[in-house]
A protein has these predicted regions:
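Alpha-helical segment proximal to the catalytic Tyr-Lys
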Residues: 10, 53-57, 117
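C-terminal substrate-recognition "lid" of short-chain dehydrogenase/reductases
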Residues: 2-5, 9, 97-131
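Catalytic Tyr-x(3-8)-Lys segment
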Residues: 83-103, 147
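Active-site helix of classical SDR
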Residues: 5, 40, 48
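Residue(s) in the substrate-gating loop at a strand-loop-helix junction
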Residues: 25
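A short hydrophobic alpha-helix cap/turn motif
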Residues: 13-14, 55-58, 70, 99, ...
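Short, flexible catalytic-loop segment of classical short-chain dehydrogenase/reductase
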Residues: 67-77, 126, 132
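Active-site loop-to-helix junction immediately N-terminal to the catalytic Tyr of the SDR YXXXK motif
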Residues: 31-39, 50, 78
Length: 147
């Protein structure tokens, strides 16, 4: 990620315009047992913010997308082998489902588009509400205060 940003970002800075979207993960936003993967994705999020600050006045925007559990071929194969329980994965998301690959692509396209011209340094979770849902589960699904 760093090398791609350095090479392509430098060219964009010279042109005075451009947009980069790095792919991170919700794993980089929360502590979890993925002791190599999670810190690497957290580094992508930090790199994104740092480059956005550094290049912000040059016309180059840098953002990230953090997918949640996405129905990729690899995840589907793990589900088919019985290595992953889709019910468990989906139960952790507020929306009760997996993310579809096209949903990640749409988020990337949005951040690259002129519609997002005022957005830089952002990390957009595309997680079907996994961050919200897993937080809710952490606290035992305590119902909200009424009144």
């Amino acid at each position: 990620t760093y090398l791609c940003c350095a090479v392509f970002g430098s060219a964009m800075v010279k042109r005075g315009q451009g947009a980069i979207v790095n792919i991170a993960s919700i794993a980089g936003m929360r502590s979890n047992p993925l002791h190599a993967y999670a810190p690497a994705k957290a580094a992508v999020i930090s790199l994104t913010a740092g480059l956005a600050a550094e290049w912000g006045r040059t016309g180059v925007r840098v953002n990230a997308v953090s997918p949640g559990y996405t129905r990729t071929r690899a995840l589907q194969a793990a589900i088919d082998r019985g290595d992953r329980d889709p019910t468990d994965l989906m139960s952790q998301a507020a929306m009760g489902r997996l993310v579809e690959p096209h949903e990640v692509a749409v988020a990337v396209g949005f951040l690259l588009s002129p519609v997002a011209s005022a957005i830089t340094g952002a990390n957009l979770p595309v997680d079907a509400g996994w961050l919200a849902g897993s937080t809710w589960q952490t606290y035992g699904g305590v119902p909200p205060i009424k009144g």
